[in-house]
Amino acid sequence: MKFFFYYFILSIFISLYTSKTPYDDLLSWGKDNSLFISDKLGMRYINENNKSYYALDDIPENTLIMDIPYDLMLNRVKAFKLLDNKKLEKTYEEFKKLKFSIDVGFLPASLEQAFLAYILLYVTSKPKYYKKTKFYEYFHYLIDTFETDLDSFPVFFTPSQTQLLQGSLALIDTTLLKELYKEEANNLEKISNKKSFDVDEYMRYRTLTTIKTLNITNITSIVPFIDMFENDPIDYNVNFKLNETNKNIFVFTTHPIRRGSTLYIRSGHFSNNKRFVIYGQTFEKTKDYIEAFQIPMISLMLQKSIKVDDENFEYDESIDLVKKKFYKNALKTYKKLSKYNKEDGSDISAYKLFLKNLQMSREIYDKTTTSDIHREFVKAKDINNVIRVLTFEKNYMDEKIGVLKKFIEKLEKEGNKIKDKKSKENKNQDL
């Protein structure tokens, strides 16, 4: 009897030791697709929405621990192509013709598809006016017009893809989106005279008209290894470098890491989509400006995903007023900065305007109450983490505002010196 008992215990230990972790398939898949991952880096499975990366051995400062090709994105339509501005230009022209909201991540294949997507966006944003809207008569044509192939919709992952995405933001986002779409479909069905769609079909088309489907935040998290873009920024042990030429992302350690220490963790349901409102202004990347105000990697990537260059751009009514105002201010900033070419540094109005926009963004945080956070992140499991990150953002903003103020003062002093010098030269010439 004892023999069987010990045999049973031993078999359990053997099975635990030899069983695959949720990330064995992920690591194997990555290495088969040109991923480099240091043999000193390990992954811990926390639950389906959380995972962490830790040091298997001591790691020196500035050590390359990952080299991630863009091609490892699980998005079926290779969403990294959205980073290519050339591809965006033609689509953006179609958007402008339709006065289509830039808040929509869908890039239509044709003008007809863009028009129908606009209808769907309008109707779903104004459900109580569903019957009254002039677009109502077109609504049922959506089913026949859009592609029905699920390969076109990155929200719908295959079982094998879902396994690879265990612990990533993309997986929990898609789950929450599906719940949201089902709720929308049921609400529309209640106020409609006839049923124009079923829930599954509606979910596919609704996928086309939400920023949370194809925006840069979700694109990066669809790469199973790049959930560090969504990590808690309070404890950065790693740094990222975007290699645009080879389309790779390098991950380095920022300081010596001890064996067993966590390098970064993907925790909770907090998205960086707010950072576009705060930092994502397009600007002329002059050397001095970059040194004075380094914008996070996520914002630099966002600038490539959304092109804002039309001062007459009209926004759909469903766009948040704060975003609407901020986009326009950011556009003005870009236009000002693009004209910054005076050697004497006298034209610093662009930087002052940027500072004003930055301060305005900071005020948005002050007006954000705890109830606002609970409402926006109502399904978040860790509200305290959200509040903690927002607090970090406030401090980060204050720091950068201070740096930018000093930079402006420096420009003013240098400009005044040059002006004084030129003034003296002119006086000497007059004499």
What residues fall within each predicted segment?
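Well-ordered mid-protein domain cores that form the structural environment of catalytic cofactors
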Residues: 33, 81, 85-158
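Proteolytic processing junctions in secreted/extracellular precursors
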Residues: 18-19, 431
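Cleavable N-terminal signal peptides of Sec/SRP-targeted secreted and luminal proteins
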Residues: 3-17
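N-terminal leader/targeting segments
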Residues: 1-3, 62
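Short acidic, low-complexity intrinsically disordered linear motifs used
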Residues: 426-430
